């Protein structure tokens, strides 16, 4: 888990560590004209954690087909100036092969999302990182539930009643799927119509569609 910081040291989005130089995030999080830094190694905001480190972003690469209206192709890769030092709390996620992602991972019951975003809509950000297990949702069910278009580059996950969902401040963060004890990146937290609303689901960038680009 990584956190994106703006020029005022406020965090506003999440990210996924791919290796010591690259962070995966959402294109909607990136403002090309602003300085961007990445915080890694944080689990609890209130504690002094030796694993924490802040890194400057040398270059933010937004997918050329990102659509700011529909959030289609909502994916970006950040290159850091200096390499990360891995530790217990700074760990890269695995990138799956495309077929394995589509045939096996996306057919698991649950994925896992994490972040430091709001506890609920218009609520406050959490102090300690939240990790939620949320079910994959059938594309047709999701399209019927949401007003905005769910494209081929997106998938849905969440509960229709439970209220567990990603929320503001979580965008760009990881959706991972566990298989045989290994965590693979399967998505990027992208958008939703509110958070945890009854009958609605969270929408994620489908990483398997972008593996060659990444």
Q: What annotation goes with each model-predicted range?
A:
Residues 68-92, 105-115:
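Serine endopeptidase catalytic core focused on the charge-relay Asp
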Residues 5-7, 23-26, 30-68, 89-93, ...:
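Conserved H-D interstitial segment of serine endopeptidase catalytic domains
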Residues 1-8, 96-101, 109-214:
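Extracellular trypsin-like serine protease catalytic domains
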Residues 33-35, 52-55, 73-75, 88, ...:
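Extracytoplasmic
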Residues 13-14, 27, 171-174:
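Beta-propeller and closely related beta-sheet repeat lectin domains
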Residues 47-48, 86-89, 121-126:
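Cytochrome P450 core scaffold surrounding the K-helix E-X-X-R motif
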Residues 1-20, 70-71:
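A conserved glycine-rich beta-strand in the N-terminal activation segment of trypsin-fold
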Residues 21-25, 74-80, 156:
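A generic structural motif
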């Amino acid at each position: 888990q990584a956190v994106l910081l703006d020029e005022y040291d406020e965090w506003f989005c999440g990210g996924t560590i791919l290796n010591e130089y690259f962070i995966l995030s959402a294109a909607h999080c990136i403002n090309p004209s602003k300085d961007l830094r990445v915080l890694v190694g944080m689990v609890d905001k209130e504690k002094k954690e030796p694993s924490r480190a802040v890194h400057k972003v040398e270059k933010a690469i937004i997918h050329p087909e990102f659509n700011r209206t529909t959030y289609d192709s909502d994916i970006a890769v950040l290159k850091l100036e200096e390499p990360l030092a891995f530790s217990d709390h700074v760990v890269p996620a695995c990138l799956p092969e495309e077929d394995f992602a589509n045939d096996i991972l996306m057919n698991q019951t649950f994925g896992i999302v994490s972040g430091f975003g709001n506890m609920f809509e218009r609520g406050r950000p959490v102090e300690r990182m939240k990790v939620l297990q949320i079910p994959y949702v059938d594309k047709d069910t999701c399209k019927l539930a949401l007003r905005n278009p769910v494209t081929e580059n997106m998938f849905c996950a969440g509960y229709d009643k439970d209220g567990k969902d990603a929320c503001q401040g979580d965008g760009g963060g990881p959706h991972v799927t566990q298989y045989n004890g290994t965590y693979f990146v399967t998505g990027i937290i992208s958008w939703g119509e509110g958070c945890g609303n009854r009958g609605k689901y969270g929408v994620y960038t489908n990483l398997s569609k972008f593996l060659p680009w990444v």
